[in-house]
Amino acid sequence: MHTEKDPNKNTPEQQTPISLNDQMQRRLEERQQLMEAGVNPYPTHFEVTHSSGEIIANFVEEAKTPVSVAGRIMTIRKMGKASFFHLQDSAGRIQIYMKKDEVGDATYDTFKLLDIGDIIGIKGFTFKTRTGEISVHAESLELLTKSLRPIPVAKEKEVDGEKVVFDAFSDKELRYRQRYVDLIVNPEVKETFIKRSAIVSFMRNAFTGKGWLEVETPILQPIYGGAAARPFTTHHNALDMQLYLRIANELYLKRLIVGGFDGVFEFAKDFRNEGIDRFHNPEFTQVELYVAYKDYNWMMEMVEELFSQTALAVNKSEVTTFLGNEISLKPPFRRLSIIDAITEYTGQNIAGQSEEQLRYTAKDLGLELDPKISSGKIIDEIFGEFVEPKLIQPTFIIDYPTEMSPLAKEHPSQPGIVERFELIIGGKEVCNSFSELNDPVIQRERLESQAKLRQRGDEEAMIVDEDFLRAIEYGMPPCAGIGIGIDRLVMILTGQDSIREVIFFPHLKPE
């Protein structure tokens, strides 16, 4: 037996020859019959003592352990005066066996008005069937929620003499729009999000275990900064002022380092008013961390340890498969300067090239450029087009030109280069980190240069933030900072090929 997608069975409306309206009408009639029989289809509570997983894990032969379990009916097999059915809860599925003679006529009459998708509570005892399946022998049944809309169910057909199970709910866009149905019928989807939660929990515990403080900073900001991106704009009516949804947390977290905290971090929703594809969502999650008295070399070692330990914690292995590639997260990761990386993968040595020379190099490589962009942006375009997709194993790309990194500290022995790295895994950026610039005079010069780039038409150039400059004028200690994209890290550790598979409710075009 194998499973495949049935092209004619993608939506709930197409699951049976009966129309959706007819099915819902029948369920509405059943709801009414239940109410007329004195059964409340939506009671307030039910006492649960065990999950399905606990029942199976703790099963003892012949013990007949009393249990109370609740969940959604996913299969029903009625055999005259007895029935088997499966309940699904957050931990999995458990089979229920029920006999009319034992639960009584009234309860069995209620059961006959139930459908796949209804949520019920069962009290009974554990046993194992003759086929060896751990089950619950029902002594009572209580309806907890009458489902009015039928859920999709897998369909088995015979194709060329072989039994084939067609997916119940496999259309990707429909899955993303109706994630609640996706979670019901596709258990592997739920596992992805459980693993996502475990990844975030492990990282949070790792940070707090080192004494760093978890904080919260503003989402609505009067000046956006900390990244090169276009913001979402809104308006505060009471203050009659324009505000922006944050594109990064960086400048506020640095203010807290100025204020005396040695390490701060924030798991945050950030927003960038840019394109949507399988690696980008306009609303995304990242964690930013800033640690005083450290630099980017220390941060690289911290990231190697963090990613390795996170993989071991959630996958029991430092090896994962992403976009068809086997990737090892075992330290140490390769380190390569951005200039050397471009030379290695394009054959072009761009060290010391002027803006005009960079444009010629890009043209030789077949890259069409916006005439408004500057040298740093040209290098970024060359790297993104010809180098980044080829970096499959974890690679720190280090030592960027100053213009590309206005918030990073200059390298002490390489003029025009800053102490910055990006971590590339599977051809995608996962982290961005600096030794943070803390000289307020140079920081002002850098931001004013960014303002000139905005005047040239670079919408992603940073804005001069006078309050941030005032903060670091009080003195910010040497500091290393990093932003880690949680969505992409989850993709890598769960083997998903789209960011929409790791976000519960991704942004989609209107229906």
Swiss-Prot record:
PROSITE patterns: AA_TRNA_LIGASE_II (PS50862)
Residues annotated for Mg(2+) 1 binding in this entry: 422, 429
Name of protein: Lysine--tRNA ligase
UniProt-listed Pfam families: tRNA-synt_2 (PF00152), tRNA_anti-codon (PF01336)
Taxonomy, superkingdom: Bacteria
GO cellular component: cytosol
Cofactor requirement: Mg(2+)
Polar residues composition-biased segments: 9-21
Entry's Gene Ontology BP terms: lysyl-tRNA aminoacylation
GO molecular function terms attached to this record: ATP binding; lysine-tRNA ligase activity; magnesium ion binding; tRNA binding
The organism of origin for this protein: Pelodictyon phaeoclathratiforme (strain DSM 5477 / BU-1)
Enzyme class: ligase
Location within or outside the cell: Cytoplasm
Catalytic activity: tRNA(Lys) + L-lysine + ATP = L-lysyl-tRNA(Lys) + AMP + diphosphate
Membrane spanning stretches: none
Keyword annotations of the record: Aminoacyl-tRNA synthetase, ATP-binding, Cytoplasm, Ligase, Magnesium, Metal-binding, Nucleotide-binding, Protein biosynthesis
Subunit structure as annotated in this protein's UniProt entry: Homodimer.
Gene3D superfamilies documented for this protein: Bira Bifunctional Protein, Domain 2, Nucleic acid-binding proteins
UniProt record similarity statement: Belongs to the class-II aminoacyl-tRNA synthetase family.
Protein EC: 6.1.1.6
Note on how the cofactor is bound: Binds 3 Mg(2+) ions per subunit.
Gene label: lysS
Keyword ATP-binding found: yes
